[in-house]
Amino acid sequence: MYKHILVPTDGSDLAQSTVAKAIEIAKETGAQITVITVSHPFHASIIEPMRVKDTLDTHDRQAEDTAAAILGRASAAARAVDVNCSTVHVRHESAHVAITEVANQNGCDLIIMALNRHRGISAVLHESETVLVLKHCTVPMLIV
């Protein structure tokens, strides 16, 4: 059935439940999973030039620490049930682009994502990353 499942996560409760579901599906099908988290690069727009390096270093360190914690939890959950799991941390302006690129580069045959529904004016102004991946990626998706 599926051989390689990509699971994007931001560490939220909703994303963590999606990771758990992906692990369950991988266990049932014998698939391996790749868990990805995407962090945005640092932008130094109004920071004093002398402080940019310190701020950049702090931002990078925090992004790495956060990603390591998120991916570590996912990897441990997969290992606990003997599911082959790799992890990827990508810095990119657009999470949906990074997700699509990693899915294609790794030969993933399924992406499992949660749908975080926006309501009211927010729904008009913001498309969810899930919807953007659906629009731009040719890899089949399971929305949970």
Q: What kind of feature is each model-predicted range?
A:
Residues 3-54, 77-86, 136:
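Small/aliphatic-rich secondary-structure junction motif
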Residues 18, 45-48, 97-100, 123-125:
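Short, well-ordered secondary-structure micro-motifs
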Residues 50-54, 103-106, 129-131:
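Short, hinge-like loop/turn segments at secondary-structure boundaries
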Residues 54-69:
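A short acidic, glycine-rich active-site loop
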Residues 76-111:
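Structural beta-alpha unit
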Residues 110-136:
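Glycine-rich, Arg-bearing micro-motifs that act as flexible, cationic patches
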Residues 139-144:
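Short, flexible loop segments at boundaries between secondary-structure elements
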